[in-house]
Design a protein with these regions (language model features):
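Carbohydrate-binding surfaces of carbohydrate-active enzymes
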Residues: 1-269
């Protein structure tokens, strides 16, 4: 209590990582009703992105469309299948004004009534995300496809949006096999003062997704941490709190100038 100061504000470096994670129950219910494949689970898909963001020590707020997006340097909408043109316009303005938007597979494929658009698949987001066209594939349990991102190869078999990018859109990752070998898996474009990244592939281990999101932060000039999975570091009212939810002892880096009030850098389970 003696160390508390009501004037404390979130450190600038931490605030620069802040991200809003967009979630809607109607979207969740509809996708669980029509999963398309027994390997798709909506909530684990969302949790995967939440967990990788927490490993960056990024402040994550789970928000609804009612919130003002402009307060977040980064915004992610995982598998946001149900939307309308109004939401796409809000996303577009957010990006033009300097926000960094991340969309993932299955986003925008249906309207608010869960009807396919009378247009190409996910047509409302094409201009925003820099997509010319897309279709999707998913593989059986026993077969894994491959994606090349940077110098690494990643396995997938849950879901793949196969993307044809529009002119001016950068391709960050491509499918390394199947009949669409060489097609885009992850695309990225600049729009106004901000960026849009579309991650078309869903993997089991999330390693591809983690490296893509890490690059989004890096391209934006925002440093991230790399906490072990299951270790969470939070900030509130001037205090950092580190929690270890794993079964093993974990070590975290603590600045030399920090004052340790409770515990140590060695976190017991």
């Amino acid at each position: 209590r003696a160390a508390y100061d009501k004037k404390n504000r979130m450190p600038k470096q931490l605030a620069s990582r802040r991200i809003g994670l967009l979630f809607d129950m109607n979207n969740y219910w509809e996708m669980e009703f029509q999963r398309q494949t027994d390997q798709w689970w909506t909530m684990p898909h969302i949790h995967k992105y939440y967990n990788l963001l927490k490993s960056f020590a990024a402040p994550v707020d789970v928000i609804s469309e009612k919130e003002d997006f402009s307060g977040y340097p980064f915004l992610i909408a995982p598998a946001y299948q149900l939307l309308d043109n109004n939401l796409v316009e809000r996303w577009t303005e957010y990006v033009k004004n300097g926000g960094h938007l991340i969309l993932t597979c299955r986003t925008g494929q249906k309207d608010r009534n869960a009807k396919l658009w009378e247009a190409p698949l996910a047509a409302p987001i094409h201009q925003l995300a820099g997509i010319n066209s897309l279709y999707y594939d998913h593989l059986p349990h026993s077969l894994y496809g491959k994606v090349d991102f940077g110098d690494e190869e990643y396995a997938w078999n849950n879901w793949a949006d196969v993307l044809t990018p529009a002119a001016g859109t950068d391709v960050w990752a491509v499918y390394a096999d199947q009949f669409y070998k060489g097609a885009a898996s992850v695309i990225h474009r600049r729009l106004g003062k901000g960026t849009v990244t579309y991650i078309g592939t869903d993997t089991d281990d999330g390693k591809l997704e983690k490296e893509v999101v890490r690059r989004v932060y890096k391209e934006a000039g925002v440093p991230t941490e790399d906490l072990p999975y299951g270790v969470v570091k939070e900030w509130r009212d001037g205090f950092y709190i580190a929690l270890n939810y794993t079964s093993d002892i974990q070590e975290i880096a603590i600045p030399d100038e920090a004052e340790m009030l409770i515990g140590s850098a060695r976190l017991e389970p």
